[in-house]
């Protein structure tokens, strides 16, 4: 039996035994279908723009906490739904098209490294349903850039790739049991494992996912390997780069709430041990355990909190890291333009002595979302970072929203690196020049034309603090974008 599947079966057996003994609860699934549209609003949220399923509903208009019942200003256009209606009942077709123009000045805080370009992404999906409890899904994706400075390739250009290819027994939305095997999306928790939809190619996993559902208890158990995008042909996954995990959800312990305990185990054959010190790599065996709580009160107040602890070993160093986040949002439903104010705090540990202490205490964000995790400039990842966010969203017209937000960033360790969303080092100080990384202000807007089309745009500016001004050639970064999105699920 392949090692990948053997470890999945071992994980399933161990987790089921522990949960059955410790909780005595019926087991159920946290399903990636029900969470792929966002995971942090209570019972999911409605995405109005192409933001990459942002960390939380606190991020403003890109994620509504409820679907908007207001009528649209434009008539619907759904060609795949029409085609689907003419096909046999056991065939479903879906289509997506996304255009985005984006640009930036001073990439990675390097003076004069500027670019602007067009992005296009097309997806075509076919579902074959042999029975109500069995289906086979395939999706092809063509992602390309235009007018971009070289080199041209991933993540913006990945031509005619196989985005999805899986078989599924059971329906996770209807049945207590389902098993999906093949190339698929996994998006249980945007903070640490997600499909990162904002990127032009996004992220897929070659995986086996077992989902178990009861009335209030849900459990997903999975073994997965992230796909490494290639410019041409079918992209492979990286052998040995595997994630195993169990992600649970218990509903309504407090009215209108979700409690989500989870455990992840990640192994990699070669991971950089201390990016702030050298590029030396070593084998990684990392375990992460966490708990997230999210809830809604009085229809107007949303709040959430999360804590994650990491242990294990990377190269010769022991892993001891942690992260947490908490936030709240309140919407004035009876006021003009329905203003919604939000605030959020994030912390991820860093390494106070990367050259000397022999312990890897920089938090590993594993496979997170890449957009609006910490503002729309997308400069930083959840590693050696302390961030405060506050902002407001207004809705001056039905299905039209405007958001403005500000963020302030600090480095818990002045001697560790500051990291980007992929976990690579942007800059680090050999001596302590201060902890303030900088501040950011963003503004963006989304408008839903009809059920299948939306458009939006935004701009963000970041100004560097003393942590960066001593080691970067630019002390500011600017980004901007305009996007048009079409998605027709074509469901009968």
What residues fall within each predicted segment?
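N-terminal periplasmic/intermembrane-space "pro-region" immediately following the signal or transit peptide
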Residues: 2-8, 12, 16, 21-114, ...
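Outer-membrane beta-barrel "beta-signal"
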Residues: 32, 46, 64, 474-492
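Extracellular/periplasmic loop regions
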Residues: 46-62, 68-71, 278-279, 306, ...
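Transmembrane beta-barrel strands of outer-membrane/channel proteins
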Residues: 95-103, 138-142, 181-183, 221-225, ...
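Flexible, solvent-exposed coil segments and beta strand-coil junctions
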Residues: 102-105, 143-148, 184-191, 222-229, ...
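Surface-exposed loop and membrane-interface regions of Gram-negative outer-membrane beta-barrel proteins
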Residues: 102-120, 130-179, 186, 190-195, ...
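Signature for the C-terminal beta-barrel architecture of outer-membrane proteins
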Residues: 133, 173-179, 195-356, 395, ...
């Amino acid at each position: 039996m392949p090692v990948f599947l053997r470890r999945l079966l071992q994980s399933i057996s161990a987790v089921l035994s522990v949960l059955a003994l410790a909780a005595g609860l019926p087991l159920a699934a946290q399903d990636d279908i029900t969470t792929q549209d966002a995971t942090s609003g209570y019972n999911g949220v409605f995405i109005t723009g192409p933001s990459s399923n942002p960390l939380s509903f606190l991020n403003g208009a890109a994620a509504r906490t409820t679907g908007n019942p207001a009528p649209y200003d434009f008539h619907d256009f759904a060609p795949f739904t029409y085609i689907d209606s003419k096909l046999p009942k056991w065939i479903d077709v879906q289509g997506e098209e996304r255009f985005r123009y984006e640009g930036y000045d001073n990439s990675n805080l390097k003076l004069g490294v500027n670019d602007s370009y067009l992005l296009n992404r097309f997806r075509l999906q076919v579902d074959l349903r042999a029975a109500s409890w069995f289906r086979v899904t395939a999706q092809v994706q063509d992602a390309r850039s235009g007018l971009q400075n070289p080199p041209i390739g991933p993540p913006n250009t990945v031509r005619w790739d196989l985005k999805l290819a899986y078989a599924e027994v059971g329906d996770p939305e209807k049945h207590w049991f389902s098993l999906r095997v093949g190339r698929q999306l996994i998006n249980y928790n945007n903070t640490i494992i997600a499909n990162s939809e904002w990127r032009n190619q996004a992220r897929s996993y070659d995986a086996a996912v077992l989902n178990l559902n009861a009335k209030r208890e849900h459990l997903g158990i999975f073994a997965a390997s992230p796909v490494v995008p290639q410019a041409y042909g079918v992209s492979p996954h990286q052998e040995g780069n595997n994630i195993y995990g169990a992600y649970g959800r218990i509903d309504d312990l407090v009215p209108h709430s979700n409690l989500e305990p989870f455990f992840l185990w990640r192994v990699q054959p070669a991971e950089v041990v201390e990016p702030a010190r050298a590029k030396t790599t070593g084998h990684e065996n990392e375990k992460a355990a966490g708990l997230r709580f999210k809830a809604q009160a009085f229809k107007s107040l949303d709040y959430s909190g999360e804590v994650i602890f990491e242990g294990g070993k990377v190269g010769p160093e022991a892993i001891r890291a942690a992260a947490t986040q908490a936030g709240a949002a309140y919407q004035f439903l009876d006021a003009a333009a329905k203003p919604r104010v939000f605030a959020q705090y994030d912390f991820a540990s860093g390494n106070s002595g990367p050259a000397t202490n022999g312990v890897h205490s920089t938090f590993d964000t594993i496979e997170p979302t890449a957009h609006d995790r910490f503002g729309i400039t997308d400069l930083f990842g959840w590693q050696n970072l302390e961030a405060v966010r506050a902002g407001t969203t207004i809705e001056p017209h039905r299905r039209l929203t405007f958001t403005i937000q500000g963020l302030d960033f600090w480095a818990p360790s002045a001697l560790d690196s500051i990291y980007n969303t992929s976990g690579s080092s942007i800059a680090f100080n050999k001596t302590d020049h201060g902890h303030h990384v900088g501040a950011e202000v963003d503004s963006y807007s989304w408008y839903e034309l009809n059920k299948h089309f939306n458009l939006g745009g935004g701009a963000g500016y970041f100004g560097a603090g003393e942590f960066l001004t001593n080691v970067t050639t630019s002390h500011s970064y600017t980004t901007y974008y305009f996007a048009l999105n079409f998605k027709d699920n074509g469901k009968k």
